[in-house]
Structure formats: structure tokens, C-alpha cells
Swiss-Prot record:
GO terms for molecular function: 23S rRNA pseudouridine(1911/1915/1917) synthase activity; RNA binding. The keyword RNA-binding applies. Residues 17-90 form the S4 RNA-binding domain. The gene is rluD. Keywords: Cytoplasm, Isomerase, RNA-binding, rRNA processing. It catalyses: uridine(1911/1915/1917) in 23S rRNA = pseudouridine(1911/1915/1917) in 23S rRNA. This is Ribosomal large subunit pseudouridine synthase D. Signal peptide: none annotated. Its EC number is 5.4.99.23. SUPFAM superfamilies: Alpha-L RNA-binding motif, Pseudouridine synthase. GO terms for biological process: enzyme-directed rRNA pseudouridine synthesis. Responsible for synthesis of pseudouridine from uracil at positions 1911, 1915 and 1917 in 23S ribosomal RNA.
Length: 324
């Protein structure tokens, strides 16, 4: 048996929800039926008190803690999957995650994840909560992630992340021609009807994204972005909110929109790019044990490079026709 502790805060946007429904949104790695069972087994504490009624209403701001024993045979299995290691020492690991690679098992992805790979290559990491995973990247977002190999390292990294002391920068291709950089400061929460989606919501958690223009193409803009917070799908939601969704992001409206008279090469490149154009390109943090300031960069993956080259070639071919 292994004991795990889950903790979270009910969001104001969840006002009026059933407790089991709210927990299912806060802990998407666990099914609603399992969470309901834990509630009924007196394992869920709300503001320090046991609540064992799944239909109990929540109001926002409540502190949730769940302490539960999980059978070993229900824990995640080690799998011999490759990891692209950028840096490693006794305390931390930095990887460059490829596309089509889920970080943590969940509904529909019980195996084949970064976590499964970590358990195989680093068996001792099973003793660290979430196998040392400090932050996540979406399945089809590529780039840098830091992993804690020990509990002290994870505790410090999580604290630094919460205090916004870890710098994460991304490159992206956004739909539309943007004229200047800026900042999106809009709170976010789970979408009220689509549980797997996030949305800008006035009662959500604070979320801040900074962005600047690197390059303009016809119909698209290449961006460098910096996260001040790290909400699920934050960059994708924020860019869609300002009417510039990421190219290829089917969830938030980034369906490819080829420019007028686009070449067949560009058309084919856009058709072949079947994910959001987002890459975690830079990670900077203070080492959790030594305090040394460390920084890593991950080159753009091949499909992203090919996309940029095709957009650039199209722009150069038609630049005499442009008025910007």
C-alpha cells in the first residue's frame, strides 16, 4: 500500500457545485466515482473537517485535503520509454519532451507517459510525489520540463514555482497578424460545460502571460511568451481570448487559415502540422539544493522548424504585395 495526499482549493467559479463534481475538476487524474467513494469513506477533509456527503455544496475558497491508501497494483507501472535528458544531477532532471507524449497518466492515458518512463529509468523516484513531476506540458506541446529526483528538491521547486521564481519561456505561432507585444492578465478556470477545457473566467485563478513579436508572416505571427503563472492550457486559452489562437490548436480555435494564393508547399505543411504550435524553449531556476542559478534551452523540433521555414518562404514570395 502507498499513502498519497491530495490538496487543493475550491475555485470561486465552482460556487454551487456538488463536492464530488468539484473534486473531479480539481483532480482530473482520478475518476469521479473513485472520488465519490473516498468522500463516503470519510477520507475527504474540507477546511479541516470530514465531509462524507458527495452532494454537499461548495462555495469557493474551501481548502481540500484527501489522504488515501492506494493498493500497489493500482499504482502506475514503470515502462521502458525513451527520455531526452538535457541535464541531470543527484537532485533534478531536465528533459526535452517530444510531441504526442502525455506527462501524467489520466483518463484515456493509463500508460505510455513521462511518469511511466521516470518510474522505469529512476525506480527510487516512486517515493517522490507524482514521481517528481513539478509542472506539466500538454500532450502535444514540446520542450523543457524539470523533474525532482528527491522529496527535498520537489518541495523547494514547487514552492519556487508558486512564488513565481521559475522562469519558463515558449515559442509559438499564433493565428493572425499581430502588431505589438503585450500581456494577458485574465483569470482562468475549468470551462463550465466542457470538463477537459479551460476558459477565461472572472472568478477563476489569476493567470498572466507576457508575449512579444519575433516575426510576422502572412496570416500568422511568431511569438516569444513568458509565463508568470502556470494554469492548465494557459498560453492556449489566453491567446485565443485575444483572438489570436495558436496555429493547429483544434481545442481553442486555431484551425489553419492559409493566406491568399498560398503555395502548395505551405498548404501541405499546414495540413501536416496536427498540433498546437507551442514549444517550451527556455527554463531558468535556482537549483533547489545548491541555489545555483541554472538555465537551459531546447531547440525547436523538426516539425516546428519546417513550419517556420514554410511560412517564411511564403512571406518572402508575397512581401511586395503586403502593406505592413
Amino acid at each position: 500500500m502507498a499513502q498519497i495526499t491530495l490538496s487543493a482549493e475550491i475555485q470561486l467559479s465552482q460556487l454551487g457545485q456538488r463536492l464530488d463534481q468539484a473534486l473531479a475538476e480539481l483532480f482530473p487524474d482520478y475518476s469521479r466515482s473513485r472520488l465519490k467513494t473516498w468522500i463516503e469513506q470519510n477520507l475527504v477533509h474540507v477546511n479541516g473537517d470530514v465531509v462524507n456527503v458527495p452532494r454537499a455544496k461548495v462555495y469557493g475558497g474551501e481548502q481540500i485535503e484527501i489522504v488515501v491508501e492506494i493498493d500497489d497494483d493500482t499504482r502506475f507501472e514503470p515502462e521502458n520509454l525513451p527520455l531526452n535528458i538535457v541535464y541531470e544531477d543527484d537532485d533534478i532532471l531536465v528533459i526535452n519532451k517530444p510531441k504526442d507524449f502525455v506527462v501524467h497518466p489520466g483518463a484515456g492515458n493509463a500508460s505510455g507517459t513521462v511518469l511511466n518512463a521516470l518510474l522505469y529509468h529512476y525506480p527510487a523516484i516512486a517515493e517522490v510525489p507524482r514521481a517528481g513531476i513539478v509542472h506539466r506540458l500538454d500532450k502535444d506541446t514540446t520542450g523543457l520540463m524539470v523533474i525532482a529526483k528527491t522529496i527535498p528538491a520537489q518541495t523547494k521547486l514547487v514552492r519556487d514555482l508558486q512564488k513565481r521564481k521559475i522562469t519558463r519561456e515558449y515559442e509559438a505561432i499564433a493565428c493572425g497578424i499581430m502588431t505589438k507585444g503585450g500581456m494577458v492578465d485574465q483569470p482562468m478556470a475549468r470551462h463550465p460545460t466542457k470538463r477537459t477545457h479551460m476558459a477565461v473566467h472572472p472568478m477563476g485563478k489569476p493567470a498572466v502571460t507576457h508575449y512579444r513579436i519575433m516575426e510576422r508572416f502572412r496570416n500568422y505571427t511568431r511569438l516569444r511568451l513568458r509565463l508568470e503563472t502556470g494554469r492548465t492550457h494557459q498560453i492556449r486559452v489566453h491567446m485565443a481570448h485575444i483572438a489570436h489562437p495558436l496555429l493547429g490548436d483544434q481545442t481553442y480555435g486555431g484551425r489553419p487559415r492559409p493566406p491568399k494564393n498560398a503555395s502548395e508547399e505551405l498548404m501541405q505543411t499546414l495540413r501536416d502540422f496536427k498540433r498546437q504550435a507551442l514549444h517550451a524553449i527556455m527554463l531558468r531556476l535556482a537549483h533547489p539544493i545548491t541555489g545555483e542559478l541554472m538555465e537551459w534551452h531546447a531547440p525547436l523540433p523538426t516539425d516546428f522548424v519546417e513550419l517556420v521555414e514554410a511560412l517564411k518562404a511564403d512571406y518572402q514570395l508575397h512581401q511586395d504585395d503586403l502593406d505592413y
